[in-house]
């Protein structure tokens, strides 16, 4: 499966990030592969909602937590 990517289900929308808010930070549960069942935080470009399946190229990297402005 590594040549095509790893499917992951969006379980929570964390927030919007990026200069114009064009990127959404989400928590996903990996559905297949070596890290099956693991929940990680990733940045997703484009429209996304809870329950969507996204294909990740790799499952090692995790996005940094969004910091709130003061």
UniProtKB/Swiss-Prot annotation:
Family under the similarity heading = Belongs to the eukaryotic ribosomal protein eS28 family.
Which gene holds the coding sequence for this protein?
A: rps28e
Which keywords does UniProt give here?
Ribonucleoprotein, Ribosomal protein
Native source organism of the sequence: Thermococcus kodakarensis (strain ATCC BAA-918 / JCM 12380 / KOD1) (Pyrococcus kodakaraensis (strain KOD1))
Tell me how this protein assembles: Part of the 30S ribosomal subunit.
InterPro entries, alphabetized: NA-bd_OB-fold (IPR012340), Ribosomal_eS28 (IPR000289), Ribosomal_eS28_CS (IPR028626)
Question: Is Ribonucleoprotein among the key words of this record?
Answer: yes
Q: Which PROSITE patterns match?
A: RIBOSOMAL_S28E
Q: What is this protein identified as?
A: Small ribosomal subunit protein eS28
One MF term in the entry's GO annotations? structural constituent of ribosome
Pfam families assigned: Ribosomal_S28e
**One cellular component (GO) term of this entry:** cytosolic small ribosomal subunit
Q: List the disulfide bonds.
A: none
NCBIfam families referenced in this protein's UniProt entry, alphabetically = PRK04007.1 (NF003080)
Q: Which domain of life is it from?
A: Archaea
List, in alphabetical order, the GO biological process terms annotated in this UniProt record: maturation of SSU-rRNA; ribosomal small subunit assembly; translation
Read off the HAMAP family from this record: Ribosomal_eS28
């Amino acid at each position: 499966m590594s040549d095509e990517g790893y499917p992951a289900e969006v379980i929570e929308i964390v927030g919007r990030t990026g200069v114009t808010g064009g990127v959404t930070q989400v928590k996903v549960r990996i559905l297949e592969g070596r890290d099956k069942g693991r929940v990680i935080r990733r940045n997703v470009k484009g429209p996304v909602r809870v329950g969507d399946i996204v294909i990740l190229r790799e499952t090692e990297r995790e996005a940094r937590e969004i910091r709130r402005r003061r």
